[in-house]
Amino acid sequence: EGRHPMPNHEYTTRILWTFAAAFHQYKNPAYLEMARKAYEEVCSAFIDPRYGGVFWMLDAERRPIDDSKKIYGQAFAIYSLVEYHAASGDAGALEQALAIYELIEKHNYDPLHTGYLESANRDWSPTEELRLSAIDMNEKKSMNTHLHLMEAYTRLYREWRDDGLRERLVSLVNNFLDHIIDSRSHHLILFFDESWQPKSGKVSYGHDIETSWLLDEATQLLTDPILARKCQKVSVAMAEAVLAEGVAPDGGLIYERDESGRPDHDVHWWVQAESVVGFANAYQNSGRPEFLAAAVRAWDFIAEHLIDRIHGEWFYKVDGERQESTVNDVPD
C-alpha cells in the first residue's frame, strides 16, 4: 500500500522462472536480462546468508519480515534457479538450487512416514506455525507443498541426474498415489497430519487439474514404464472428474467446493490456465475429443474474460457473473 512494495519470495522466483523460460523458448535477450535482474534479487536479498534457504518475505528495504523456511517457497526457489541455469548457463544458479535441495532433505523430510513437513524456523528448527496463508490449515503436511516440490524436483532432475534425487522424486509421486489423491473421487486431499491422516474435505479443482499433468510430467522423466502407465491412468481419471464436476457451460473452471459440497463459482486466472494445460495433456494421453474441446473452451474463456484488453495482463479472477476482480487472496 502507498506504493511501498513488500517483496514476496514466491513472486520474485516466479518472475525469475517466467523470464528464464521465455528466453529458453524465444531467445529474446530482453527476457534473459529480466531473468538476470530477478536472479540477482533472489541471491542478494532472499537467500539467507547464515542458515541457507530463502526468506519468505522482505520489506521494501529488503529486510526480512518473515524469515521462516516455508518448503513451498523453497520449492519455487529450486524451480526458478534451475530454469535460470538452463537459460543462462550460470553454474552458480544450479549450485544455489542444490544447496536448498540438500537443506530440505536434511531438515524437513520425514523418514518415518515419507513426505515433507510444511515449514521450519529460520535456522531450520521445527516450528508450530505451518500455515502458508491465513486461510490454510495449520497441519504438518499439505498437498500444495508436495505438488510444488514434485514440480521443482522434476525440473532439477532434468538438469542433474542424481540417484538420490530420483529416489526422492519417486517417493513424491508415490505420496500422491498412496495418500494425496483420493482413489474413489479422483480429487486431492488438501491437508494431513504427520502420518498422512486426512484433515480436510474441500475440493480444489485447479489443483486437481494441475496435479494431473505435473504427475504425468514427473513420471515420463523417470523412465519407469510401470509407474508411468499407472500415473497416466490416474491423470486421466483426475481430468475426467474435473471435467464432469467443475467446468461451467462457458468453459470456466470453478474454484472449489467446500466440505458441504457448496461450489465457489469464481474463476481464478491460474485455475483457468492450468485447465488448458491439464485438459490438453489428458487429450494427449487418452485421445478423447472431449478433453481437447475442454482445453479449447478454457482458452476461449481466458481470451474473453481474463485478459485485460485495455491495460494488459490478466485479471486475477472473475466471479460467477463474470465480473472481474484484481484481489489476490489465496496462494495457488
Please tell me what each predicted stretch does.
Residues 1-332:
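Glycan-recognition and catalytic cores of secretory/periplasmic carbohydrate-active enzymes
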